[in-house]
Amino acid sequence: MDPFADTLQRLREAFVSGRTRPAEFRDAQLKGLSRFLRENKQLLQEALAQDLHKSAFEAEVSEISISQNEINLALRNLRTWMKDEKVSKNLATQLDSAFIRKEPFGLVLILSPWNYPLNLSLGPLVGALAAGNCVVLKPSEISKNTEKVLAEVLPRYLDQSCFAVVLGGPQETGRLLEHKFDYIFFTGNPQVGKIVMTAAAKHLTPVTLELGGKNPCYVDDNCDPQTVANRVAFFRCFNAGQTCVAPDYVLCSPEMQAQLVPALQSAITRFYGDDPQSSPNLGRIISQKHFQRLRGLLSCGRVVIGGQSDECDLYIAPTVLVDVQETDPVMQEEIFGPILPIVNVRSLGQAIDFINRREKPLALYAFSNSSQVVKRVLAQTSSGGFCGNDGFMHLTLASLPFGGVGSSGMGNYHGKFSFDTFSHHRACLLRRPGLEKIYAIRYPPHTPRNLRVLLMAMETRSCSCTLL
C-alpha cells in the first residue's frame, strides 16, 4: 500500500481548484508561518538543543530569526512579486501587451536536512507558499526532535488541504520520490542529490539542489592574523562545524601559518574557554555515525590545536591540523565538523590553482588587506558564493541568491529568489483580433520587400517604450 498516495492526491486536487493562487490565501499562509515561530519559540529552541546542543544564541540567529526575516520580506513584497512583469517590445508587437506572468508550479516537494532543520525547512517553504504552490515537506529524520515539532505542530498553522509533512528515512524517501511532483527542492550532500535528480528526471521534474563541498579559505600574508583567526574560528565552529558554507580548509604560506595557529588558539580559548566541552556555546555532532567519521579524520596531518573527542557526549574539540597533504582523507570530503586543516601554498597563484583543480565549492573566502588580492581570487575562481575578509555573512543578505554551482548544487533561493525559484515564468503576448491587413505581410507568397519590412519589424529594440 502506498503511504503517500492519499496525501498527494489531496494536495494536487487543492491546487487544481485554484485555492492557493489568490494573494489573500498566500498572505494567510505566510502569517501562519510567522505565528508558528512566535508561539513555539521555546519549543523550537528546546528541540534544537536536544538535536544539536544548539545554544539559544545560535538557534535565534541561524534558525528562528533568519526564518522570520524571510517571512517578513515575503509578506511586505508579495503583491509586488506577483505582478505581471512588462517587457520591452519590437515594432511588430507595439500594439500588443507583452509580459511575464509568475505562476505556481503546482505540487512541490521540499527535502530538508538535519544541520539547520528549522531554517532549511522554512526558508524554501516561504518561497513555495508565497509563489502559490501546494507543498509536501519531508524533514530529516536524523534531527528527530525538530522533525517532531515540524510534523505535529506546524500543520496546525497552515491550510492542511494544501500543505503536509511526511516522515521517514531513506527507504520512505525513495518511495516518495517515485511520485510525480511539479518541483523538487533538496538540501543535502551531493551523493543523495544525484539520487534525487535521477528520480526527478524520470518525470522531467525541475529541481533545485542545495549541496555542499569543500569551501576554501585563502589567507594572504598581508593581513592581521588575529582578526582572520577570530572570524575563521567562529565560522568553522558555529553549529559544531556542521554548516555547508563553513570554511573547510585554509590555504596560506608557511610563514602565515606560524602566525595563524597561535591566533586560532587564542580565539578558540576566548570563545569556548580552556575546556570547550563545558562551553554552552559549542554544539555537538548530530549522531554516532558522523562522530566516528570525524574522529577518523583526526589522524590526518598533525594536530596542533584540540584533537580531543568524547564518544558518549558526541563531542569533537575545535581542532586545527597542519602538515596536511592534498591526498589525505580530510581533503577528500566535506568535513562537516569543527576540524580545520591548513594546507601550505607558496603564492596566490598556487592557491588559485589548488582551488581550481577541485570541484566548485558552495562558498569561497579570501582574507587580505589588499583589495586587489581579494578581487583576483574572486575573478579567477568559481563558487556558489564568495565573501572577502569574513565568513558566511553573505547568507544574511536576502538580496543575494544562495546556491551552488557544479557539484555544489544548482538553482538558488532566499528573498525574492525563493519566490522566483518556485514560480514558472510564463511568457505572454496578448494581441488584438483585428489589423489583419497589417499582419498579412507574414503570409505567402513572400516577396523581398515583405521580408525586409518583416525583419525590420521583428528587430530587437533596446527601448522599452510602448504605445499602450
Swiss-Prot record:
Modified-residue entries (Cysteine methyl ester), positions: C465
UniProt-listed PROSITE patterns: ALDEHYDE_DEHYDR_GLU
GO molecular function, one term: benzaldehyde dehydrogenase (NADP+) activity
One BP annotation, GO: ethanol catabolic process
Catalytic reaction annotation: an aldehyde + NAD(+) + H2O = a carboxylate + NADH + 2 H(+); a long-chain fatty aldehyde + NAD(+) + H2O = a long-chain fatty acid + NADH + 2 H(+); a medium-chain fatty aldehyde + NAD(+) + H2O = a medium-chain fatty acid + NADH + 2 H(+); octanal + NAD(+) + H2O = octanoate + NADH + 2 H(+)
Propiece residue ranges: 466-468
Domain of life per record: Eukaryota
UniProt cross-references to Pfam families, sorted A to Z: Aldedh (PF00171)
Entry keyword Transmembrane helix: no
Signal peptide: none
InterPro entries in the cross-refs: Ald_DH/histidinol_DH, Ald_DH_C, Ald_DH_CS_GLU, Ald_DH_N, Aldehyde_DH_dom, Aldehyde_DH_NAD(P)
Enzyme class: oxidoreductase
Pathway(s) the chain acts in: Alcohol metabolism; ethanol degradation; acetate from ethanol: step 2/2
Keyword Acetylation in record: yes
Entry's EC annotation: 1.2.1.28, 1.2.1.5, 1.2.1.7, 1.2.1.48
Function summary: Oxidizes medium and long chain saturated and unsaturated fatty aldehydes generated in the plasma membrane into non-toxic fatty acids. May have a protective role against the cytotoxicity induced by lipid peroxidation. Short-chain fatty aldehydes are not good substrates. Can use both NADP(+) and NAD(+) as electron acceptor in vitro, however in vivo preference will depend on their tissue levels. Low activity towards acetaldehyde and 3,4-dihydroxyphenylacetaldehyde. Able to metabolize aromatic aldehydes such as benzaldehyde to their acid form.
PANTHER family: ALDEHYDE DEHYDROGENASE (PTHR43570), ALDEHYDE DEHYDROGENASE FAMILY 3 MEMBER B1 (PTHR43570:SF2)
Protein name per its UniProtKB record: Aldehyde dehydrogenase family 3 member B1
Species of provenance: Bos taurus (Bovine)
Phylogenetic placement of the source organism: Eukaryota, Metazoa, Chordata, Craniata, Vertebrata
